[in-house]
Amino acid sequence: MNLYEFTFIAQQGLLQQEVEGMAQELGVSLKNIKADIMFQQIKGILEKGSDKFTKRDSEMHAKDIQENLIAYSSFLESFAKILWIELEEDLSNLKEVKLKISKELKDDLKGLGIAQGFIKLPEGGKQIAKNAFIHNAVSALKEDISKHLIKIFQGILQNFGMAEPNQSNKTLEMLLDNIEASGLIKYEYWGLLDFAYPINKMKSGHYCIMCISSTSNIMDEFVRRIKLNENIIRHLSVHVDKFFEGKSHMMNKQVEEQSA
């Protein structure tokens, strides 16, 4: 699970709500990219595993596996977002956050057959950073998910001559890499700000930062598509260890300047 702070500058002619809408659309784009990568990865594995099936057969089975992966992935997204947004830095409100997860994701937990025992503090009262705690919780949940998915996969993989336990486990492990990518966790609009020098003859632009949990291959494709977006004139992707809590440094600085 990689964390990124992705900052983009949108054209000055847009309205604030249009820029914020763009950030949300980019979040949807991350979901779609993940689904596309999953499908292509699954199809490639199936096609290499057997030459007895047509391209249509491979695509049909790949779609079945993809749908199961997306269901679990969507749950992981919701789970991770609650932890990142609601959990205090010192984990002091963990009990309340666990109740929120149980309440909001109750139907998903039941429908996906997931037991609620994956959010645990370190033994012996050891201190742990919030980002490390979330990573451990997501990894534990991912392991629980893999136990359910292997049962689904084995039947499909058997048709492709890939039902050996070790081979099935390796295939599943490869496919599970992308489901940890939670996508857009939160975003922050910084406002219409002046440039130090003109960019494409423009003197100002709308600044927005997105906090993203993703994999490198998903982010590579995301950035490639960003470059095709005519409304975005500049962008910067930075790999970080953790997301900022509350407001970003940029927003706090703006508040200080306005108060001075």
From Swiss-Prot:
Signal peptide: none annotated. Pfam families: Ribosomal_S6. GO terms for biological process: translation. One of its GO terms (molecular function) is structural constituent of ribosome. Keywords: Ribonucleoprotein, Ribosomal protein, RNA-binding, rRNA-binding. It comes from the Bacteria. CDD domains: bS6 (cd00473). InterPro entries: Ribosomal_bS6, Ribosomal_bS6_sf, Ribosomal_S6_plastid/chlpt, Transl_elong_EF1B/ribsomal_bS6. The keyword Glycoprotein does not apply. GO terms for cellular component: ribonucleoprotein complex; ribosome. The keyword Zinc does not apply. HAMAP family: Ribosomal_bS6. Belongs to the bacterial ribosomal protein bS6 family. Binds together with bS18 to 16S ribosomal RNA. This is Small ribosomal subunit protein bS6. It comes from Wolbachia sp. subsp. Brugia malayi (strain TRS). The gene is rpsF.
